[in-house]
Amino acid sequence: MDNEIFDIAIIGAGPAGLFAQFYAGLRELKTALIEATPRIGGQITALYPEKTILDVAGFLGISGRDLVNELKLQTDLVDSKTFLNSEVTNLKKIASHFEIEINHHASFLAKSVIIASGNGSFSPRKIDVPGSSEAEQSGMLTYLLPGLSEVADKDFAVVGGGNTAVDYAVELIDHDCHVSLIHRRDNFRAMESSVTKLKNSRRTNFLTPMKITGLSPKKEKLEIELQSVPDGAVKRVSVDRLIGGFGFTASSRTINQWEEFPEQFNQGFLTNEAQMTSIAGIFAIGDASIYPGKSDLIATAFGEAPTAINQAVNYFDPDRGGPQHSTSLNKKEVFKHDRIKSRYNS
């Protein structure tokens, strides 16, 4: 890896980074995809591989795991390098290149950098009530969906009022579970169609406006103590498992130590219409990017990736030309792939 020079280094192997790797390959750019963890897929792989994703064009619905697999198949079509277990511990400018330090020792050079690292590492916002530690140790309190092949006809409770909790509840009723949805308010801050689906399902029990005041693991069930928000009345329910759906907090401590550190707002890097950050040659896409009017969707990230790639080329090789349509790119190698041949030669 040392002394190797790439056209583009993409930091982060979530959906945005994977699609950027594929598009860069279509443009025949020498590309490195760098991922700090042992697996590709980013937040999807870590947090919701079983979740059905509805906002990706061309799919009526696709699980997080299947989407990552499809993206991996795309990247296999092009010539590029992927480095796993490789945390970018420093990024600095050297002459006309960026030096990228990996795991505090190995390094290589890139003509441009695309940050696709999302919001960094994630940890769940945990429930803090009497008995919550014991419930988590017993496995009856979790913060991620279980394997959905094993949950049919189980009784679950999900707590929270945002997209995380509502999405969890929808996945569970879609797999024939009974779900009690606990929220301290009557209204939910989530996709309206998902809330409507829960309201129309006989498998959903709304426990609102209520809050959890205690947890008590029994032999096979978890007893949840609830308190009514308006009048303080206490109620108890028993479930097979409780899932915390308060979302996750992000940490970007390693990124914050880079020598070249673009301007940030909240957890994202401020980008312009070219997806360029405050530092020329460094771009950001997906959840790592923020700009006025942005929608934090996978679909948005997929659109940002080609913009960043094409503008990166314009940065380090302005004579090479601007945006390219897929029909004008070199597909000679791509169409050697059996899966592509079978689709287009039928």
From Swiss-Prot:
Keywords: FAD, Flavoprotein, NADP, Oxidoreductase. The keyword Flavoprotein applies. It is an enzyme of class 1 (oxidoreductase). Binds 1 FAD per subunit. It catalyses: 2 reduced [2Fe-2S]-[ferredoxin] + NADP(+) + H(+) = 2 oxidized [2Fe-2S]-[ferredoxin] + NADPH. Its cofactor is FAD. The keyword Aminoacyl-tRNA synthetase does not apply. It comes from the Bacteria. Its EC number is 1.18.1.2. FAD binds at E35, Q43, Y48, V88, F122, D287, T327. One of its GO terms (molecular function) is NADP binding. Gene3D superfamilies: FAD/NAD(P)-binding domain. Transmembrane segments: none annotated. Belongs to the ferredoxin--NADP reductase type 2 family. PANTHER family: THIOREDOXIN REDUCTASE 1-RELATED-RELATED. Homodimer. This is Ferredoxin--NADP reductase. The lineage of its organism: Bacteria, Bacillati, Bacillota, Bacilli, Lactobacillales.
